[in-house]
Design a protein with these regions (language model features):
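Output/docking surface of receiver
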Residues: 8, 23-26, 79-112
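Cysteine-centered metal-binding/redox modules
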Residues: 107-185
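Short, structured coil segments at secondary-structure junctions
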Residues: 17-19, 71, 92-95
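Conserved phosphotransfer microenvironments
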Residues: 40-66, 79-80, 86
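Short alpha-helical segment
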Residues: 29-32
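Conserved acidic segment of CheY-like receiver
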Residues: 1-9, 16
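Conserved phosphotransfer cores of two-component systems
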Residues: 36-37, 64-72
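Proline-centered loop/turn at the N-terminus of a beta-strand
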Residues: 2, 72-76
Length: 185
């Protein structure tokens, strides 16, 4: 399989070890190479980037799925964290698969992109079922957002154990806020 990898952060430059991968570092180059090279799949990495750049990558996904030359090519989004609204926007753009990269304090080793083959659990709709529908996000600055609980009228900041072990898993189905959301203050 031939892969086109778009990584605007440049972090995957030294990590990809496959002759079947073409690496680009901008959405425009990605769209251009997708039309020229006709890869089997486009892998788009959403790293630690500005929110504006994240929006540009989501727009790229939509352009790939709407372009007559590229709409049949599978798109796989690699996210560094679980983010419900990003996954929803990717679904709306036509992305089929989302995979979450493990966060690690150690530098990442080489990635063989041929092992990024999506599994049924990576389907966008499956990932959305896992994430609590009340996850909301409030912009802090041009690069960061804080996660808040919509079931608690966006007044509770989420993080740590609650976010990772309840809100971002099927555990949200037993959450007291999910089961009894506040309607008004």
């Amino acid at each position: 399989m031939k892969f086109l990898v778009c990584d605007i952060s440049g972090e995957m430059q030294r990590m990809i070890q496959s002759s079947d991968a073409i690496l680009v570092n901008s959405p425009v180059r990605c769209l251009n190479q997708a039309i020229i090279e006709r890869p089997d799949a486009v892998v788009i990495r959403f790293g630690d980037i500005a929110l504006r750049e994240r929006d540009a990558l989501i727009e790229l996904c939509g352009a790939l799925k709407q372009n007559q030359h590229t709409k049949g090519i599978g798109v796989i989004a690699l996210l560094c964290s679980k983010h419900r609204s990003v996954v929803e926007r990717l679904r709306d753009a036509g992305v089929e698969y989302v995979r979450f990269l493990a966060k690690s304090k150690q530098p990442q080793t080489a990635i063989d992109v041929t092992t990024i083959k999506p599994e049924p659990k990576d389907q966008v709709d499956v990932q959305l079922e896992i994430l609590c529908p009340y996850l909301h996000y409030s912009k802090i600055d041009s690069r960061h957002e804080m996660t808040v609980c919509g079931a608690y009228l966006d007044r509770m900041v989420l993080g740590g154990h609650r976010l990772h072990e309840i809100c971002e898993t099927q555990g949200h189905l037993q959450c007291e806020y999910y089961l009894n959301p506040r309607r008004k203050s």
